[in-house]
Amino acid sequence: MSKELSPKYNPAEVEEGRYQTWLDQDVFKPSGDTEAKPYSIVIPPPNVTGKLHLGHAWDTTLQDIIIRQKRMQGFDTLWLPGMDHAGIATQAKVEERLREQGISRYDLGREKFLDKVWEWKDEYAATIKSQWGKMGLSVDYSRERFTLDEGLSKAVRKVFVDLYNKGWIYRGEFIINWDPAARTALSDIEVIHKDVEGAFYHMNYMLEDGSRALEVATTRPETMFGDVAVAVNPEDARYKDLIGQNVILPIINKPIPIVADEHADPEFGTGVVKITPAHDPNDFAVGQRHNLPQVNVMNDDGTMNELADEFNGMDRFEARKAVVAKLESLGNLVKIKKTTHSVGHSERTGVVVEPRLSTQWFVKMDQLAKNAIANQDTEDKVEFYPPRFNDTFMSWMENVHDWVISRQLWWGHQIPAWYNVNGEMYVGEDAPEGDGWTQDEDVLDTWFSSALWPFSTMGWPDTEAADFKRYFPTSTLVTGYDIIFFWVSRMIFQSLEFTGRQPFSNVLIHGLIRDEEGRKMSKSLGNGIDPMDVIEKYGADALRWFLSNGSAPGQDVRFSYEKMDASWNFINKIWNISRYILMNNEGLTLDQARENVEKVVNSQVGNVTDRWILHNLNETVGKVTENFDKFEFGVAGHILYNFIWEEFANWYVELTKEVLYSDNEDEKVITRSVLLYTLDQILRLLHPIMPFVTEEIFGQYAEGSIVLASYPQVNATFENQTAHKGVESLKDLIRSVRNSRAEVNVAPSKPITILVKTSDSELESFFKDNSNYIKRFTNPETLEISSAIATPELAMSSVITGAEIFLPLADLLNVEEELARLEKELAKWQKELDMVGKKLSNERFVANAKPEVVQKEKDKQTDYQTKYDATIARIEEMKKLVR
């Protein structure tokens, strides 16, 4: 057991060294119990590009909550950690660092550059693991993986070769998205489209015979040197007679043909379209149909090449200005029309993406997508939480394009294809035998390897690997909605293809972390928050509590320091009530407490408040477990918060002082037992969310680690509706008196007469039997409880279920003000009656709702009507006083 709890909650003291202790105790490893049901999660591998942000903290907190609860519930749990090499992002970071030293990757060469990247990886992997520790993540480091590990690399090569041999991976020259900053191809989903201010540049292309000019328009005039034709619609009467003739390409005076193609829309612009097959996907298709040449006028860094004539070597955007100026000087510029249009930008480097003709490797997606779609029509489909994201997944799969998987980078999985001087190509998991072969210099898209993450980390392609057999498919994936297509969909179709099984049973989708104003956190806005700074100020438990309670599945969460203050205050409350309970524990053990609690629920010992709190605890266990199972951590947190702060701390702990400050030692032992038992159950319920503080408090009274303690379960013997109903009525009475005092500014310390009128004999007996609690909380000079109480002439009155409460206030009350208060109360009951009446008059509701739900509404109606009638009566009495 640990040392005594400090007088003040200090998260730094509580959390210091605790994580290392857990690691030393090996409590995060699978139990190895073959009789237990396995439950596995693979961590979405963070990029080794830098520190983790709040989004990572949220993502991993949710996973840790799940795995810690399942571990406590007796599952054989595995949470497998790892990191992603993040090809383009990491290479860009390392190149940026080298540029600061005046070095480029080309100065170093591939091998030495990769040495630098591995150094970067080691540096930031250590940083990430340190952050995981501060967050308290219960991962099994003995199984840590990296996407460039040899085992994972072997899986990548096998998948590539198998897909190639099936004809589902092919190499070809097509228009792709090109990042001129990173000098690599990008897939469609790595391109972010933004609305930007631009212009349509209208130009005249003169017919070769000089008889007339055709007007064309483009937003990218710098690509005109790659024009190989102009197209008109074959049905466009304006140009039918021109088909087959030539126009002269301005500046370089090159003749190009006029072709007939339906790509040209007679209703749009002039109906004449310039065709640049090497720089536009639609033009590429036109070029294929008409067997047109492909003229690439741009270098891979976004500068113009020698085919751009005098603009050779200029940046594409500088060339745009210069070309327009030249066209104007030649008389070919007709007009410039400002416009706002959508322009693709690289997700990683932020630069404008260039459509560019390039030889790349592609995955043919037709059948892979069909397999994924078909799987979602089975009973064993992947369940999305919330379910609406299944529609998002299906929509993407139904509209998927072939996936460009090659990247012109050095950091990553080098494509397992080799070429020789004879123009032959060899694709295989290992290099071909013999000399004269050169491996393809490109690497695979990072998502190609991370798509294999759930099964490659478990030992696949060795299907006899122990972890693969035991923990695959995994149980739950937690991730953000922004990478459903990037990652989730690809894991699903790759897993179905190569293992015959889906990679996980559930996908929990969370949103994005936003600032207090609802803005996405970003470097450009300067509103990003380092989770380590938050932990330093508030502790990891407070951050985890906020992150788990911030929103529902699929929703964004707004970060605020006000919410962090509230989180810290809640933990401080738990700390203080724990200190109170443990300071009054008198050496009671948890086993002794359990034995005594069993007697309490069997009504052998204890009082009604003991049975009430145990009943409510049992209900809380059921509701929290139910919501955990649905990944509704926010709902579960609200239930826990209400039980701990309101029912346990504010009511039960205060009620126990009546016993603990008495001389009855037998009753004290029972009260201490209920307090300790309830605290223990609370800590176990909280542990998945707040691992550090619960471990610290648990260590005061129990042996071992709470990490491996059993999770609370619903116990039918704890149910006691009589105790629940009675104490809730008692609370209503006390609250009513307190509220009445407050309304007329009568201090709690001032004794006052309290009259409780009830015709319910059971309630009357209950109030009398427990009048000690009423007196303790309301400070009456006189307390009368009876059905025969005469209504006082002038009194504060209130109505609770089954009783009326009067506080005679002849010397303290303004009658007119009391009458106004009652009118307000009457309006409140009328509003409640209108609402419930509207619901019960809805035939559809009555017909479709569960009978118990309808009955609950009817009970509400009866209760509200009783309160309404009693309030009417009091108003009439008060009016008599006024008269």
Curated annotation (Swiss-Prot):
Its GO CC terms are:
cytosol
What positions carry the motif 'KMSKS' region? 520-524
Lineage, top-rank taxon, reads Bacteria
Q: Which PROSITE patterns match?
A: AA_TRNA_LIGASE_I (PS00178)
Alphabetical UniProt keywords: Aminoacyl-tRNA synthetase, ATP-binding, Coiled coil, Cytoplasm, Ligase, Nucleotide-binding, Protein biosynthesis
Motif 'HIGH' region in this chain: where? 46-56
Query: Which residues does the record give as ATP binding sites?
Result: K523
Using the record for this protein, list the coiled-coil segments as residue ranges, or answer none. Answer: 809-844
Entries under Gene3D superfamilies matching the protein: HUPs, Isoleucyl-tRNA Synthetase, Domain 1, Valyl-tRNA synthetase, C-terminal domain, Valyl/Leucyl/Isoleucyl-tRNA synthetase, editing domain
Q: Which InterPro entries match?
A: aa-tRNA-synth_I_CS, aa-tRNA-synth_Ia, Anticodon_Ia_Val, M/V/L/I-tRNA-synth_anticd-bd, Rossmann-like_a/b/a_fold, tRNA-bd_arm, tRNAsynth_Ia_anticodon-bd, Val-tRNA_synth_C_sf
> Which EC class, in a word?
ligase
The subcellular localization recorded is:
Cytoplasm
The protein's Enzyme Commission number: 6.1.1.9
Q: What is its main location?
A: cytoplasm
The Gene Ontology biological process annotation of the record reads:
valyl-tRNA aminoacylation
Q: Name one GO molecular function term.
A: valine-tRNA ligase activity
Q: Which reaction does it catalyse?
A: tRNA(Val) + L-valine + ATP = L-valyl-tRNA(Val) + AMP + diphosphate
Assembly description: Monomer.
The UniProt similarity line reads: Belongs to the class-I aminoacyl-tRNA synthetase family. ValS type 1 subfamily.
What is its biological role?
Catalyzes the attachment of valine to tRNA(Val). As ValRS can inadvertently accommodate and process structurally similar amino acids such as threonine, to avoid such errors, it has a 'posttransfer' editing activity that hydrolyzes mischarged Thr-tRNA(Val) in a tRNA-dependent manner.
What domain notes does the record hold?
ValRS has two distinct active sites: one for aminoacylation and one for editing. The misactivated threonine is translocated from the active site to the editing site.
Q: What is this protein called?
A: Valine--tRNA ligase
Organism equals Streptococcus agalactiae serotype V (strain ATCC BAA-611 / 2603 V/R)
Q: What is the lineage of its organism?
A: Bacteria, Bacillati, Bacillota, Bacilli, Lactobacillales
- Please state the gene responsible for encoding this protein: valS
